[in-house]
Amino acid sequence: PEQTGSTGAYENVELVTEGEKAKELEAQGKTEKEIAARTEPILGGAELTMLAGQTKAQMMSFLLETKKGGLIVVDGGWWDDADYLKEQIKKRGGHVSAWFLTHAHTDHVGALLNLLQSEADGEDTGITIDHIYYNFASLDWYKKHELGDLGTADAILTALAGLPKGEACPVKKGDEILVDDVCITVLNDRYEPDDDHVGERDGNDASMVYRMLVNGVTILFTGDLQVDGGNHVLETVAKEDLKADIVQMAHHGQHAVTKEF
């Protein structure tokens, strides 16, 4: 799929995990006490990594390693981010316990689509996935509200439909998924505007919101929510449920939800 996303103004930077930071400090000759003071675990032994994009376009890709070694992926990025994503997954054992998708835009599902289509073509990618969780609108909805992303929606829905029974898992508001000691809650119903409303980026507002409870720390993933979708969440989800210690800023931190969110 063609990459047409807006370009980011940031360098290709990847977050450093607590374990990697400890190794770096040890190499610098720091004492155990100094290392402990500068690498206090935020997630109680789990590690969250925000992967850097491999193109100049904005994307979203997160890996969460549980304390017990399970791996959770959120979105994954563009088609051209797939090789780097596969490399990072393999570094963590090559097995994904749960893959969560926020919405069917190429800068979020392209890498997974690349992976699934490669597997369907007979390639051994070296990656195994237990379950993929999603809630996408129908193709008729995309024809009405976001014709420009119809191709991506069609491709990812087709790929998911071709998976073995039980691997592709549609979700709804209130669903809870357990991966080791991590609890993931689906907070919202997908926002669907009235048929007479055709927004500029309705597919962004259709993002699913996932709350992850990781060893007492709450992480909120908001996808690409913008004003209408964000307001829908505020109207239908208890404010207490939206409170979080770590928040993925909606829509790459720009043109997103309101300040009230």
Where in the sequence are the language-model features?
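Long, structured stretches of catalytic cores involved in phosphate-ester chemistry, encompassing
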Residues: V237-F261
